[in-house]
């Protein structure tokens, strides 16, 4: 684990948003994510398959296997027929949205994997749809989560606003991105369930809040290194007075 931390500090290893969000829950959660097998739920697999069907359909057969097989050497991700049906509902609802066709026509790139640098840290991002002056991110979710009240809760609980900030960042420092916030691309969530699809814009104010939360995460990362607190749970974030970085 120490080697991984050292690589991140030296800029030799990039942090994904998933790994960063685990750290924002607790240092111990980050360590578990990085050191133990990560078992994805059926909902996660359906969401991933829906993404591939939307943005890279030709690769779906090479990445996923539908149904059972006797071939023990088949290393593809296993999906049941029910998983596929649910994923196809997501895909259909996104494509059926009145604005989606125009969004795809204006897109210059889809499912773009990039590594950026912010305040000296390398971060990985995957832009579902990059449309020059706007970035769109598809979120698959349950029916209750798509309501404005519940989705607002998910934004803060899952740090979606931090993800939005990372995805629209254009400058090498957080301060510069906040200073030039009006020049950054717009950010939209394409929130889709098995029965509905809603496109919601992330306000500039919320993106700024995401940058501030990211800045706090970088500060907490340094505190964690200084105190060697990688085994701590969420109580780590309640002990700022005891875990101060020495000048």
PLM regions and their residue ranges:
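Metal-dependent nuclease catalytic cores that hydrolyze phosphodiester bonds in DNA/RNA
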Residues: 1-126, 235, 239
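Hydrophobic (often cysteine-bearing) scaffold residues that line and stabilize catalytic clefts
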Residues: 42, 46, 163, 210
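Conserved catalytic cores of phosphodiester-cleaving nucleases, focusing on short active-site segments
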Residues: 125-150
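Secondary-structure boundary elements
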Residues: 100-104, 131-137, 172-183
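A short acidic, glycine-rich active-site loop
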Residues: 152-161
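Metal-dependent nuclease catalytic regions and adjoining charged, substrate-binding loops involved
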Residues: 87, 156, 166-247
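Short acidic, glycine/proline-rich loop/turn micro-motifs
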Residues: 146-152, 199-202
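Coil-to-beta-strand transition motifs
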Residues: 120-124, 131-133, 195-197
